[in-house]
Amino acid sequence: MAYFLSDGLTKEVEENKNYGGICTIFDEDYPVLLKEIYNPPLVFFYNGNFSLLNAPTLAIVGARKHSPYAKEVLKKLLPDILDEGIATVSGLAKGIDSLAHKITLSEKGKTIGVIGTGLDRTYPRENFELQANMEKEGIVLSEYALGQKPLRFHFPARNRIISGLCQSLLVVEARRQSGSLITANMALQENRNVLAVPGNINSILSEGCNELILEGAKPILRAEDILEEFKI
């Protein structure tokens, strides 16, 4: 509570006023699912279509260095998912994250980006145009105020928001020690549906997904497998 009475928050609100919006956990329109998680952000900043944060949402995570198979999978799955009004959410990182956002936009769908910097920064820099497009066609949000640089501990914290905003989380490709598996575990702890794309048993990029399936994650072979989780 002290944070909401502090000069620091007042300054952050003023700085973000002309850039986008700000939402606190006390606001009526704070995302319902996000509020349910163990450690929801007390404040977050956003730029884009706020209503998407209460839409049916599929989180998509995976390897930063992915194979062509991952692109084929998302191009096959996403059109039917997006046609049902389901938004995608990911972290605007290299690899699967960026791929999911780009394919969603190319299919005229809605996508949510959760970043580990202030909204006035782009990390990685190569996603500058993608982030700008998402602010127009979807929404980008962060619990970090303007000017905040990317710090290592920001990204695990960001992942809890990704899993917190979704009803279901899909892991597309992941190594055995991938950070995507940590996000999947967060989703599981928050009672979200964890889904995984099975892959070649000889590919290190599919080891994490195949092991998730062995542990009980739902294997995804077609879009209908995902839509079932949304009762569609």
Where do the PLM segments sit?
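Short, small/acidic-rich helices and loops at N termini and domain boundaries
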Residues: 1-28
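Glycine-biased, small-residue-rich flexible motifs in mid-sequence functional cores and linkers
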Residues: 25-232
